[in-house]
From Swiss-Prot:
NCBIfam families documented for this protein: 4OH_2_O_val_ald (TIGR03217), PRK08195.1 (NF006049)
Cited PANTHER family: 2-ISOPROPYLMALATE SYNTHASE 1, CHLOROPLASTIC-RELATED, HOMOCITRATE SYNTHASE-RELATED
Protein name from the UniProt record: 4-hydroxy-2-oxovalerate aldolase 2
Keyword list, A-Z: Aromatic hydrocarbons catabolism, Lyase, Manganese, Metal-binding
Disulfide pattern: none
Site-annotated residues for Transition state stabilizer: R15
Enzyme Commission code(s) on record: 4.1.3.39
InterPro entries: 2-IPM_HCS-like, 4OH_2_O-val_aldolase, Aldolase_TIM, DmpG_comm, DRE_TIM_HOA, PYR_CT
Gene Ontology molecular function: any one: 2-isopropylmalate synthase activity
CDD domains listed in its UniProt record: DRE_TIM_HOA
Pfam families for this protein: DmpG_comm, HMGL-like
Species this protein is from: Mycobacterium ulcerans (strain Agy99)
Catalysed reaction, written as an equation: (S)-4-hydroxy-2-oxopentanoate = acetaldehyde + pyruvate
Length: 347
């Protein structure tokens, strides 16, 4: 930490927001957003395909512009901010990490399901060997108990991870659920690694949960300007800064500048506002990975079944990131029920 901030903010609008934009960012948008966030004092800006390095694919959706080109542009544009990139083992490769560093990325964020931290070991090791700052993401953190999450965090820290995040991928955690998990990681990791929190707005608690995380000891917090992220979006950075200013938590980000960036630069690049609607609420309530939203809407249109029912059943099946294709099976199941006159259950 430096004297500039008590908590370091990472803006994920150019990565998590890629889900909302169906990975269709163009260089002009990325350059303008990076410049505005950098000028406002945002210390870390994450840039990649929504599903991380190598995510551009038939399964996840193809990028309009190469993520490596966007990382390079972001690094060339930012005067002070560091450029982070996300990587999911099994989606991206070690070579992708090296290329991202060559293009100016300096923070490598490795994401795994919350029970599978062991698959990150070699990638975290490589990142440290390359001299990159390392962050670990334990996704779908609501699905396991705090002590089990802490044990997974220990695996990442021992592999060289410098900050392990409690990642509320579904926006399903509620206040104490965040505080308990962050506190468990802080107790387990001590001085070995920092703890971070990444929230979503699917139950409308992105900002409140982030405050709980900081009070429990988190030193890094994610958000997206204008909630530009998957599902109902992430905690809006401009609101986070306003709240943190009010409670005396230093971030180094100027509230008025980030509010201007959200309104004047980021919003025009968004296809629509990220909404807390029925689909998003169902994801938070049922514990569904936030990036499932656009996939569910697509299958809803294709098969003529309600997206919210698809999402609810995805939660019942406890699907995780990477299992988006199972939404097709669920859609066909609901379609058969409709044709036979069955009424879909809400429970």
């Amino acid at each position: 930490m430096t004297g500039i901030w008590d908590v370091r903010i990472t803006d994920t609008s150019l990565r998590d927001g890629s889900h909302h934009k169906r990975h269709q960012f163009i260089k002009e948008e990325v350059g303008a957003i990076v410049a505005a966030l950098d000028a406002a004092g945002v210390p870390v800006i994450e840039v990649t395909h929504g599903d991380g390095l190598g995510g551009s694919s038939f399964n996840y959706g193809f990028s309009k512009t190469s993520e490596q080109e966007l990382i390079k542009l972001a690094a060339q544009t930012a005067k002070e901010a560091k450029i982070a990139f996300l990587m999911l083992p099994g989606v991206g490769t070690k070579e992708d990490i090296k290329e991202a560093q060559d293009n100016g990325g300096s923070i490598c964020r490795i994401a795994t399901h919350c029970t599978e931290a062991d698959v990150s070991i070699q990638h975290l090791g490589l990142a440290r060997e390359l001299g990159l700052e390392t962050v670990g993401f334990l996704m779908m953190a609501h699905t396991i108990a705090p002590e089990k999450l802490a044990a997974q965090a220990r695996i990442m820290a021992d592999a060289g991870c410098q900050c392990v995040y409690v990642v509320d991928s579904a926006g399903a955690l509620v206040l104490d659920g965040v505080a308990d998990r962050v506190a468990a990681l802080v107790a387990e990791l001590g001085e070995d690694a920092q703890v971070g929190f990444h929230g979503h707005e699917n139950l409308g608690l992105g900002v409140a949960n982030s405050v709980e995380a900081v009070r429990a000891g988190a030193k890094q917090i994610d958000g997206s300007v204008r909630r530009f992220g998957a599902g109902a979006g992430n905690a809006p950075v401009e609101a986070l800064i306003g709240v943190f200013d009010k409670i005396g938590v230093k971030t180094g980000i100027d509230f008025f500048d980030i509010a201007d960036a959200a309104e004047d630069v980021v919003r025009p690049a968004m296809p629509a506002e990220c909404l807390l609607d029925r689909n998003a609420l169902i994801m938070g309530y049922s514990g569904v990975y936030s990036s499932f939203l656009k996939h569910a809407v697509r299958q809803s249109e294709r098969y003529g079944v309600p997206a919210h029912q698809l999402l609810h059943r995805a939660g019942q099946r406890k699907l995780i990131g990477g299992q988006e294709d199972q939404l097709i099976d669920i859609a066909l199941e609901i379609k058969r029920e409709q044709e036979s006159g069955q009424v879909a259950s809400r429970r």
